[in-house]
Amino acid sequence: MIYSQSELLTLVEQAIVSNRWKREPEGLYAPIEYVLSLGGKRVRPSLVLMACNLFTDDLTEALKAGLAIEVFHNFTLLHDDIMDNADTRRGYATVHKRWNNNTAILSGDAMLIEAYKLLATVKSERFSEILKVFTTTADEVCKGQQYDMEFEKRNDVGLDEYMEMIRLKTAVLLACSLKIGALIGGASEADANTLYNCGINMGLSFQLRDDYLDAFGDPKVFGKNIGGDILCGKKCYLLLSALELAKGDTKSELDSLLALDNATHRDEKINGVIDIYRKLDVDKRCEAQVSAYLLKAMTNLDRLSVPAERLEPLKNLIKAMANRKK
């Protein structure tokens, strides 16, 4: 049986509901319950299930692993929100705003432990390999977050450094999801590694698309105002490309725009920087990279020893993520 994306999403949501964290002390677990109730795309557990379904119809153990990865992912978001001092997540108050910083830190710690407890319930002859992939990935995600924070204080960040940072912060968890699903499903080592590489390329394409949409997305579709990265001086692909390409008067103009005060020159700053992006064809450059990594991900899938029809749900998801409008 080949499961559709909607069928897999239903399985994931049912698993989350059945694993409610209504325990004592309530102050520790209520924030976990809250975070997991806020929804989201559930991309990572869906990838675990899709990868497993390439090789088997039995998704029982993959669902456990998918839930573990989703809990881990939300743990990273919870702690990211503290570091970013974010007010909202998915339209709702963040945990540290609804409760407080100490509660958010401790509940986040508990979520990380819960993720490992859930993973430990997976029955597989390849569990040691599954655990190794998960643990290595968790370590890499932390490294990616640290690099991201360090980049905020640096003015000499290069594109290669940025690509490595987003590989660690974003792409490796997607790759981990695919590989763990494949291992549970009985994939060969070669196929499992190919799916891991697919996840890396998928993740890079996803993050570059996110960078693009922040400046060139339709606010009505994107769901938020454009230019957020510009206002906060985030080292994204667009800005780093512009800083690399800008020369002479264009470089001076870009530097002047970036130095403008957000409160008094918000629109001038956003529109001016976006105009320079267009002048330097940074938007086209970013779109080309999104397409290039999408193609690499698709090429990875075509190398699998799997019937073509089983690949369709995964291919459709990857295309949708790379071409999304929000």
Pin down the residues of each PLM region.
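Mg2+-dependent prenyl diphosphate-binding active-site environment of isoprenoid biosynthetic enzymes
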Residues: 7, 17, 21-251, 319
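A short structural micro-motif
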Residues: 137-140, 201-202, 260-264, 279, ...
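N-terminal leader/targeting segments and the immediately adjacent pre-domain N-terminus
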Residues: 1-16
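Hydrophobic, well-ordered secondary-structure elements that form the walls
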Residues: 239, 297, 314
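Short, amphipathic C-terminal "tail helix"
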Residues: 293, 305-326
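An amphipathic alpha-helix signature
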Residues: 13, 17, 49, 175, ...
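Amphipathic alpha-helices that form helix-helix packing interfaces
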Residues: 12, 205, 297-300, 317, ...
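Mobile late-domain/C-terminal helix-loop "cap" segments
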Residues: 251-301
